[in-house]
């Protein structure tokens, strides 16, 4: 196979980074590549598509998914700092590798939007499974800091559950000379922040196998007005856990504190969730099956000692069908994900396509 075609595609995708759920040019480029180089069936949906290698009377279907969206840097500029250009190019390359071959199965290549916000996997899994329910589903992510091309495996939790939790508390504004005449939300919001370590310990009992985190990303109360004691305040937290149920327990505890504190002080509150990701969990039986195939084909593997702390919306698929989420080493000295210096390494394209083709054939 001519891997220079895949490299050229990856570089073309790199030059047109697009926001989550707005991957219009990316989809056009990918579909054009597949039309020109394969005979795969293309099924266009709203904001996403899948390409199908169909065989008559095939007894099973294997699905492989890639994400397409870019991220923003601190200046609001879009760039492919997570390597989704590479993931999409790998999946298109897999389509090219399978062209004209008889596999004894159908293979569905899913090009998914909106991974960075967690919206894409939830929507696409629901829409895809209404039409086509795979017997096994694969996903992967490049991992800087690990040997190039090494397949990274982990049973049970591979990537953390996470969500963004926002609280808005409304009290009563007053003159700073008479703060007792008002209700400033700063005290309740501070009480919640200071209680977080104890809440976490109460849930996990200090078990290192039950990582649970709450990171304050923003706290804002009032304005820089030295004559006004604030009447409104907001607190934004990122909750993250190895186990989704632990994260949801912590969320309930925080909301209970907000409810109780507001009732006590005569204030009101509201909350919202953003960027909700489930935990990405590999069933042990699926992990053993994949590991056996990789070992039989003498492909390099490494077992991760702990889950990735970041989140990945492939977990939505794994809640519904058997499957496996893999890491692919991007190089031990490669720049980290979401950093300014990061770019997907083209040297990973060939080994990644080989890994996926091997698994698709053997599963």
Can you describe what each PLM-predicted range is?
Residues 190-363:
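Metal-dependent amide/peptide-bond hydrolase catalytic core
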Residues 95-102, 130-131, 318-320:
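Alpha-helix C-terminal capping segments
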Residues 49-52, 70-81, 85-86, 101-218, ...:
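Histidine/acidic-residue-rich, glycine-tolerant segments that coordinate divalent metal ions
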Residues 1-17, 100-101, 125, 167-172, ...:
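N-terminal hydrophobic/helix-forming segments and targeting peptides
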Residues 13, 64, 84, 109, ...:
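Divalent metal-coordination and catalytic microenvironments
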Residues 1-81, 86-103, 108:
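Acidic/His- and Gly-rich active-site-bordering loop/insert found
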Residues 63-65, 165-167, 325-331:
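Non-cysteine beta-strand/loop elements that form the S-adenosyl-L-methionine
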Residues 65, 139, 232:
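Structural signature of FAD isoalloxazine-binding scaffolds in flavoprotein oxidoreductases
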């Amino acid at each position: 196979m001519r891997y220079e075609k895949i490299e050229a595609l990856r570089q073309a995708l790199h030059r047109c980074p697009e926001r989550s759920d707005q991957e219009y040019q990316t989809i056009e480029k990918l579909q054009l590549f597949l039309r020109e180089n394969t005979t795969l069936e293309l099924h266009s949906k709203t904001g996403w598509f899948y390409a199908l290698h169909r065989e008559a009377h095939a007894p099973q279907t294997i699905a492989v998914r890639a994400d397409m969206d870019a991220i923003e840097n601190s200046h609001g500029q879009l760039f492919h700092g997570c390597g989704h250009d590479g993931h999409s190019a790998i999946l298109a390359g897999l389509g090219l590798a399978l062209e004209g071959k008889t596999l004894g199965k159908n293979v569905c290549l899913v090009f998914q939007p909106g991974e960075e916000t967690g919206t894409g996997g939830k929507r696409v899994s629901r829409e895809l499974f209404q039409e086509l329910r795979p017997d096994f589903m694969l996903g992967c992510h490049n991992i800087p800091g690990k040997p190039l091309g090494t397949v990274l495996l982990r049973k049970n939790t591979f990537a953390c559950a996470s969500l963004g939790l926002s609280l808005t508390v409304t009290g009563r504004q007053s003159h700073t000379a008479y703060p007792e005449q008002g209700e400033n939300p700063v005290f309740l919001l501070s009480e919640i922040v200071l209680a977080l370590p104890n809440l976490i310990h109460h849930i996990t009992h200090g078990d290192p196998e039950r990582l649970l985190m709450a990171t304050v990303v923003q706290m804002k109360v009032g304005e820089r007005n030295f004559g006004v004691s604030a009447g409104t305040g907001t607190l934004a937290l990122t909750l993250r856990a190895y186990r989704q149920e632990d994260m949801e327990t912590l969320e309930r505890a925080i909301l209970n504190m907000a409810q109780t504190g507001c009732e006590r002080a005569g204030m009101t509150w509201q909350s919202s969730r953003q960027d909700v990701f489930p935990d990405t969990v590999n069933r042990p039986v699926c992990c053993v099956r994949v590991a056996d195939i990789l070992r039989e084909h003498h492909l390099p593997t490494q077992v991760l000692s702990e889950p990735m702390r970041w989140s990945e919306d492939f977990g939505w698929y794994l809640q519904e069908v058997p499957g496996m989420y893999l890491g692919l080493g991007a190089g031990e000295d490669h720049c980290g994900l979401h950093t300014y210096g990061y770019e997907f390494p083209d040297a990973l394209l060939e080994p990644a396509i080989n890994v996926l083709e091997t698994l698709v054939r053997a599963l």
